Amino acid sequence: MELDINLLKNTAEAIVNKHQLPGMGIGVVSSKETLFIDGFGYSEIETKTKHTKNTIQRIGSITKTMTALAAMRLVEKGKLDMEAKVTDLVPSIKFNSNFSAIKVKHLFTHTSGIGEMPEKKDFSASDIKLWGDTGPFDIPNHYPNGIDVDFEPGTDWHYANHAWGILGEIVARVENDSWHNVIQKMIFDKLGMSNSYPGDDPVEGMSVGYHRDLGQDELDRMELIGDELIYGDPVDEVNIRGLKYDYVGTAAAGSVMATLEDMCTYSKALLNKSNGIISQDVFDSMLEVQYSPDPDLSIKMGLGFQVKSIFGHYAYGHNGGISGGWNTVMLLFPKLDFGLMIHLNLSSGLVEEITDEIVYALLGKPAIDIVKTPINDDQKNKILGVYRQRPGFVARSRPIRSLGRIQIIEKENNLYIQSRRGEWREATKIFKSDYGSNIYVVDDGKINPTLISINGDTLTVDRLASLDKDNRAKTW
């Protein structure tokens, strides 16, 4: 792929100005070399400290790919069995379940049946079950009442940081070492990532995290659970310095910090199928689709990696977000032999839009144009109605908070999607797409528009969460 450096720089500068970002780092690599690496804006606004390739970033959930590589190395060496029961490996963890046993393979794929809080009663305090004031949790003792399981393992998908905390505990026990030391030796030392840290203790050269004013969804939630509303004052027109530094309690799910330069090294290793951390065949197995609710939706789940289609191009990778101030993107396009790293010291839902703008500048015209066509009467009558999150409040707490119920309604001969919370809080027009027989495109104005699947009575958003039609529920 021929890289237009000037176009990339101009795009990055325009994005920083358009979205009033504190700072951003961009790295582009091939399997052989770093093609571009630079910082834009500030790692700290108040002191006007520049964002550079050496600025240290909290990479959040990209950590999961490192935990996955370490675990798969143990699998390859015969030290860990993907079919092993989790309770056999960590007997002190109890699962409150009437379902089959959770196996190691379920932890890799967010299909274990657990969610973003251990128990239903933790709804109002779910954050403190994930974030800590003083470093990582003692995983076996972090769940004194056990962890609720809401669906048969392997049959559904919902994001679960706690599952990755447990997988990290398993890796540590198998190696008879701490997870932090395992990642240091297996990943950082192996690849020469000398400015990377498995833990998230603040270090010199680290960017300051910023966020924006609370949106309606956050305000609604905080009022509902009785949290104190603490706004903070912008240090410029819009960016608010993080009021509190939270540690990732489930460290193996998201505690790594690294410079952009080191993450480019990591991306090059992944384009080379791990550079010897595991064999190429085992690495290929990590990219095989383990869960996909609809084959026509772009995002699917491998082992630790999300597998997706972006502008018609095959890609894999992961995003990472840290509450209070950081978003990170890692995308690898193996058929094009390039990878992209984006470091933002801003906690914001803007990250997907920013990513699409940068990828579009790199790729030019999409390989596949998504055609939008009107929805005919037969299709319309099948999809109109209200769709509810499936039973299981613990496992599905994230989509319940971010979307809630979804309705497909008709206004002035057009169909609209509307959610109780989130980006479709205001009704947004939808069209039929030629991308797949059950695929509809949301007319959200994005250069990479959102796709949804409606297959029978099941609506699936391109985040792998599925909702079922409730014929008794009323539209609003």
Model-inferred region functions:
Residues 2-59, 79-81, 141-147:
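Short, conserved catalytic-motif segment at the N-terminal edge
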Residues 4, 8, 59, 63, ...:
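Hydrophobic (often cysteine-bearing) scaffold residues that line and stabilize catalytic clefts
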Residues 8-12, 26, 32, 56-83, ...:
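Active-site SXXK
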Residues 33, 44, 97-324:
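Short, surface-exposed loop or secondary-structure junction motifs
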Residues 82-96, 191:
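Short, glycine/proline-biased beta-turn/loop segments that scaffold the active-site neighborhood
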Residues 249-255, 316-349:
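Glycine-rich phosphate/pyrophosphate-binding beta-alpha loops
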Residues 306-310, 331-335, 409-411, 453:
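Short beta-strand micro-motifs enriched in acidic
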Residues 353-476:
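Peripheral terminal and inter-domain segments
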